[in-house]
Curated annotation (Swiss-Prot):
Gene3D superfamilies: Endonuclease Chain A, Polyphosphate kinase middle domain, Polyphosphate kinase N-terminal domain. One of its GO terms (cellular component) is polyphosphate kinase complex. GO terms for molecular function: ATP binding; metal ion binding; polyphosphate kinase activity. This is Polyphosphate kinase. CDD domains: PLDc_PaPPK1_C1_like, PLDc_PaPPK1_C2_like. It catalyses: [phosphate](n) + ATP = [phosphate](n+1) + ADP. InterPro entries: PP_kinase, PP_kinase_C_1, PP_kinase_middle, PP_kinase_middle_dom_sf, PPK_C_dom2, PPK_N_dom, PPK_N_dom_sf. ATP binds at residues 42, 464, 558, 586. The active site is at residue 431.
Length: 675
């Protein structure tokens, strides 16, 4: 018997749970639409990175197998098979929601169903807003098929010259920055691509439009950097980002159009692909013909529309922790260590702490890591302001996938302001979230530390669940300062910390040691691990051994889980759960009954434990330990948003009509009570 679930199929099962939220009839309609948008965006990234990586392995005949022993070719086939039915489910769900929205006055209307007045408005919109932005190409001997960037959305048309009667083909690129949903009347929307299609004869004068289809390509978007050759890492990353859009096509999505037109499109795509693709004749590319609009990720436009608030869940306003009501946050932290649970407790104190430090004349230095900060960052702006007055040292991780460009921008801005900027660490990704502020008062140095499971990004802090920790303890600050020094001197793999634990050297051995300790207590042992993913085979094997010793193990794994639970003789004492709700579960909390409870930036994956700089923080303060344990206990009682994984790899939603509990709703209400 194989002891592990396949990683890729486990991720797809997570995205299925996202799709299930779109099917939840208890949710407002735009909330359901939101989950369809998330589903599609997730799948885009899965193809850009995971499927693209498998294709590279397959095409280069690299004998690399998944944790379950499946070859790249086998995994690609399993992915295609898994999605074949689910893509149809997604289309049906969209059509159901679309019909329900129509009854509520929000209409996504096909162009051919518009009346004459609405078509006139669409024509005006085309002339004033779209005509100058679309890029039409007539494909002939002097105009070959142009390269397509990742996530290109375009129309492919069969056209005929009215005078010569000669037929040819045309490509019309639609820019990504245009509004997809065009509001012609209050609540009535037409799709931009359908408006363009209806006016193709204005782009190709004296031509008849014989056939047309919308299509979208997804390309390999991973960035391969040879760090050994990097003299200027920022410059190398900048050049690599420019190449991201030139990757091989891994997925083609089409809508409408004849089979003959699709064949011609495939032949045209083949004409500019690399030798590898010509050799394989595009057989590795996954092709999906859609009965609905392409790219449901654009549904965010409707979800965020200001006129339809009644069709969404009420916005929750994160609450300020009562201990932070004082004007001087540093005094608050000096009194006691504090733990916040975002988004239920506001992220504002984190921003305020940096802003207060920047304006405080007693502040000597700020040291901080930045992983994903977003395009509009009040935190970076505060650091830029501080850099003109005090010592500011920032490690900006340029390898944060899909945030590389934003991070590079902020790194350059910080450098211009006078901050010391370090662009990551050689062959490691710095994923630890840490901040230490040093002040001088009464002729003494005082250190204030902030550590978190989540990013320094106020926007994601409103939709991700994370814990963040504030302390004025010297032993914690000393460890963080030591870690910063090791990052600056590229000795992160050789240093060890005294109070905290860091990857790649300390976290994995520590977790194994903690599992072994619970094994010594046999049936009295108890482990709860909450993480985003569980993939590391060594950790899984130790959990199997602990189960066989009688240790009870509850795993709350949001996404990928390669461990097989409830297998007799292997893992019958292990239960695996997943919570999918309005907030993305992102905190990592690790509880060991006979030792301690920890929180961490690290998931239980080889990349986190072996190839990243991460932190594992013990909760030595009893109040904080109890708060972390309370989070786990409530989530293990969830009967509305919690799924359980069985030994066959299937997830079933847990339901108890007599005791309904949505853990995320519970924490919202609990935050209100603390005021």
């Amino acid at each position: 018997m194989n002891r592990f679930f396949n990683r890729e199929l486990s991720w797809l099962a997570f995205n299925t749970r996202v799709l299930n939220e779109a099917k939840d009839e208890s949710l407002p309609l735009l909330e359901r639409l939101k989950f369809l948008a998330i589903y599609d965006t997730n799948l885009d990234e899965f193809y850009m990175i995971r499927v693209a990586g498998l294709k590279q392995l397959y095409e280069h005949k690299i004998a690399s197998k998944g944790i379950d022993g499946a070859s790249p070719e086998e995994q690609l086939e399993k992915i295609k098979h898994y999605l074949a039915h689910e893509i149809e489910e997604r289309e049906l769900e969209f059509q159901k929601i679309q019909a329900l929205l129509f009854k509520k006055g929000l209409c996504i209307t096909p162009y051919n169903e518009l009346n004459l007045e609405q078509k006139a408005k669409a024509k005006t919109y085309f002339k004033e807003q779209l005509y100058a932005l679309v890029l039409p190409f007539k494909l002939d001997s002097s105009h070959t098929f142009p390269p397509l960037a990742n996530l290109t959305f375009a129309l492919f048309a069969h056209i005929k010259d009215k005078e010569t009667q000669s037929a040819s083909y045309a490509l019309i690129k639609l820019p990504s920055f245009i509004f997809r949903f065009v509001e012609l009347e209050k609540g009535l929307f037409a799709l931009a691509e359908e408006i363009v299609e209806a006016h193709l004869e204005e782009l190709f004068l004296e031509h008849e439009i014989l056939d047309c289809m919308a299509f979208r390509v997804t390309c390999d978007a991973d960035i391969a950097i040879t760090e050994d050759e990097a003299h200027d890492y920022a410059d190398l990353m900048s050049k690599s980002l420019r190449k991201r859009n030139q990757g091989e096509i891994v997925r083609l999505q089409t809508q409408k159009g004849s089979q003959e037109l699709l064949k011609t499109l495939l032949a045209s795509l083949r004409s500019f692909q690399t030798h590898s693709y010509k050799k394989h004749k595009l057989t590795g590319m996954h092709i999906y013909k859609s009965a609905i609009m392409l790219n449901l990720g654009d549904l965010w436009e409707l979800v965020n529309h200001s006129d339809f608030k009644a069709l969404k869940s009420p916005n929750f306003t994160p609450k300020i922790h009562p201990h932070f009501n004082e004007n001087d946050l540093f005094k608050s932290i000096e009194k006691q260590d504090l733990l916040l649970f975002h988004p239920y407790e506001s992220f504002e104190p984190v921003i305020d702490l940096i802003e207060q430090a920047a304006s405080d004349p007693t502040t000597l230095s700020i040291k901080m890591t930045l992983y994903r900060v977003g395009k509009h960052s009040p935190i970076v702006k505060a650091l830029i302001e501080a850099a003109s007055k005090i010592q500011v040292s920032v490690l900006v991780e340029l390898k944060a996938r899909f945030d590389e460009e934003s991070n590079l921008h902020w790194a350059k801005a910080l450098e211009r302001a006078g901050a010391l900027v370090v662009y990551g660490v050689f062959k490691l990704k710095v994923h630890a979230k840490m901040l230490v502020i040093t002040k001088k008062t009464d002729n003494q140095l005082r250190h204030f530390t902030h550590l978190s499971t989540g990013n320094y990004n106020p926007l994601s802090a409103k939709i991700y669940t994370d814990v963040s920790f504030f302390s004025a303890k010297n032993e914690i600050a000393n460890d963080i300062i030591k870690l910063f020094h090791s990052l600056l001197t590229s000795s992160a793999t050789s240093n060890t910390l005294e109070t905290l634990f860091m990857a790649p050297k300390q976290i994995k051995p520590k977790i194994i040691e903690l599992i072994q300790n619970e094994m010594n207590h046999k049936q009295e042992g108890y482990i709860i691990l909450k993480a985003n993913a569980l993939v590391d085979s060594e950790i899984i094997e130790w959990l199997y051994q602990a189960s066989q010793k009688g240790v009870k193990i509850d795993l709350i794994i949001r996404g990928i889980c390669c461990l097989k639970p409830q297998v007799k003789g292997l893992s019958e004492n292990i239960r695996v759960y997943s919570i999918v709700g309005k907030y993305l579960e992102h905190a990592r909390i690790y509880y060991f009954k006979h030792e301690n409870i920890y929180f961490s930036s690290a998931d239980l994956m080889p990349r986190n434990l072996e190839r990243r700089v991460e932190l594992l923080i013990p909760a030595t303060n009893p109040k904080i330990a109890n708060k972390l344990l309370h989070i786990l206990e409530i989530q293990l009682k969830d009967t509305l948003k919690r799924y359980e994984l069985n030994s066959k790899g299937r997830y079933a939603k847990i339901s108890n009509p007599n005791d309904p509990l949505n853990s995320q709703d519970y924490f919202e209400k609990q935050a209100l009570k603390t005021l």
